[in-house]
Amino acid sequence: MRAKKVVLAYSGGVDTSVCIPYLKHEWGVEQVVALAADLGQGEDLEAVRQKALASGADQAIVQDAREDFVYDYAFAALQANALYEGRYPLATALARPLIARILVKCAQAVGADAVAHGCTGKGNDQVRFDVSIGALDPKLKVLAPAREWGMSREETIAYGERYGIPAPVKKKSPYSIDFNLLGRSVECGVLEDPWAEPPEEVYAMTKCVADTPDQPTYIELEFERGVPVALNGASLGGVKLVGELNRLAGENGVGRIDMVENRLVGIKSREIYECPAGVVLVLAHQALEALTLPREVTAYKRGVEDTYAQLVYNGLWYSPLRGALDGFIDFTQQRASGVVRVRLHKGTATVVGRKSPYSLYDVELATYSEGDSFDHKAAEGFIYVWGLPTRIYAQVRK
């Protein structure tokens, strides 16, 4: 027996559904509590809960975690402009430490001696769950049936069918999909060929560019200390703001990402992401920082952002390093307040305006027209001192 009572991170998909009978029949677990987190994935979570019970769970719980997800994870990463390998807004990676936190709290509440997840041995999520759970409760046992059972996807589906679990995917195109409020990721099937163009059927949040409006859509995003608080002048809570921005950007074909990325486990993986709100928010936030942060801070922050994104992707959300980086990021956001105007059109998002009460932009210094207050005479002395090391080096070389 691996454990008596287990809390399982449950999604309603093939792997987590099969985990329920597998834990009971193969590993002798006496009680399985299926826990589904509502992260804005748009599913009928009551149906997911009922499916868990039908699959053999002794108890099935749905927890609304949308507010926590947006404010504690998504917006924290936004302040860091966190994009993995410069492109991916980390929608899935950000959800895992939150789910781990919910799992641990539930396990402690119901007296479980272990938690479980349905991650395979190839993916990043196994690392994110195991490391996060270990950081939150080092004594809690973590079970990963899909990492050990050695079944192919077809065999996993067949195993589930033995226990009355229907397969929710077509065997001819078995896409693996993860979806939450911040975005959607798709892999498997024809997408495993990096040369193959993704069929339109893999997309759900964004329109094909050919079907988008001919006229651009303009939006205004207001930020306070790096956190979005209003869209087009309307103050909105984080969940509603992200949802509405997903709709507006998605209708204009914004947010599609097709990339071959480097997984933590050492392999390359072709991933299709849809992150309409995530892409636009990072773009707008970067534009606001360009207006309000000094040059040296902006330059240094880029390195912090890359490290931050790697930490999140690699499952180190609860690491001391991320906590230390948060201190720096929090300082940079003290004056990251203002409004950014973005044009959405035919698959592109373009910043076309920005303003802030803390703007470091001085039009009288920047203008080439009448009213120029820049001291042009000072430039000669500045250039002499600035270029002095280069001239000395050139003299020595001679």
UniProtKB/Swiss-Prot annotation:
One of its GO terms (molecular function) is ATP binding. InterPro entries: Arginosuc_syn_C, Arginosuc_syn_N, Arginosuc_synth, Arginosuc_synth_CS, Arginosuc_synth_type_1_subfam, AS_cat/multimer_dom_body, Rossmann-like_a/b/a_fold. L-citrulline binds at residues 88, 124, 128, 176, 185, 261, 273. Its EC number is 6.3.4.5. It is an enzyme of class 6 (ligase). It holds the Pfam family Arginosuc_syn_C. Keywords: Amino-acid biosynthesis, Arginine biosynthesis, ATP-binding, Cytoplasm, Ligase, Nucleotide-binding. L-aspartate binds at residues 120, 124-125. GO terms for biological process: argininosuccinate metabolic process; L-arginine biosynthetic process; urea cycle. The keyword Amino-acid biosynthesis applies. One of its GO terms (cellular component) is cytoplasm. PANTHER family: ARGININOSUCCINATE SYNTHASE. Homotetramer. Belongs to the argininosuccinate synthase family. Type 1 subfamily. HAMAP family: Arg_succ_synth_type1. This is Argininosuccinate synthase. It comes from Gloeobacter violaceus (strain ATCC 29082 / PCC 7421). The gene is argG.
